[in-house]
Amino acid sequence: MYLIEPIRNGEYITDGAIALAMQVYVNQHIFLDEDILFPYYCDPKVEIGRFQNTAIEVNQDYIDKHSIQVVRRDTGGGAVYVDKGAVNMCCILEQDTSIYGDFQRFYQPAIKALHTLGATDVVQSGRNDLTLNGKKVSGAAMTLMNNRIYGGYSLLLDVNYEAMDKVLKPNRKKIASKGIKSVRARVGHLREALDEKYRDITIEEFKNLMVTQILGIDDIKEAKRYELSDADWEAIDELADKKYKNWDWNYGKSPKYEYNRSERLSSGTVDITISVEQNRIADCRIFGDFFGQGDIKDV
């Protein structure tokens, strides 16, 4: 498995939109003889699921006040807040695409690594989460792109939970379905569960430990790296500017509608909003934290 990190001219890039653009660019243009791993951490960011309505998922006043980045990813699932207290493990898998949709198998390398580091109570739970003593410490998403699985998951070492609680506005039905009253009550952190010798590690050290465990190597220096060229980085910058830093992609048009219906289904939350003019449906939008195999506009 190749390792690709957001390192440019020796500098670690902590811009979450750049990290996302890098992964998508590689998926579209770089084809190697093995799978690819993209580990990264970034500045405070809210990542929105492909099919979600950003306007109802985030506290925009809090985002503006604290300069938190909002980026929409290409995979489904729900909104997540991450910062430099979380490691994001993304990947491109083409050696065995039968894993698509099977989050238990997808998570196995991470679970094994966390258990080795002392967090032996971490388990795969629900549709696409990892939990520690009943609290969520990771959420995963994946999609099929170019006949390859593109996906990833966050690992919450110890993020800013106050910011997480204030910036996200999760669907009340989703929260109620889990028997909890707030985001903070639902989310845990991994640091306290690690073996004592790892509890004071930095986020960089945690990232490297996870990478070495997943790749089965003793030192991060042993990883098989793929280095992006200057031309690659220029294309990544362009993609980030045109898409992942573009308001139309991240927010889009979120007008008010006359009718709204939200339901919590086995596949996730589905929110349908309809505008009616002269007794005819003028517009219909479908949002949610579900995982789709196509584009909503095709429905």
Where are these regions (language model features)?
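A generic structural motif
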Residues: 93-99, 161, 192-200, 288-292
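Residues forming anionic-ligand binding surfaces in small-molecule and nucleic-acid pockets
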Residues: 74-94, 175-194
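Internal, well-ordered alpha/beta segment that forms a basic, Gly-enriched binding/recognition surface
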Residues: 121-126, 130-185
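Active-site cofactor/substrate anionic-group-binding motifs, chiefly glycine-
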Residues: 55-79
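A hydrophobic, small-residue-rich beta->alpha segment in the mid-to-C-terminal subdomain
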Residues: 174, 178-195, 277-299
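Contiguous, small/hydrophobic- and glycine-enriched helical/loop subdomains that border
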Residues: 86-127
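Active-site loop/lid in soluble adenylation, ligation, and acyl-transfer enzymes
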Residues: 1-55, 142, 181, 187-207, ...
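Short beta-strand elements
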Residues: 141-143, 155-157, 263, 270-290
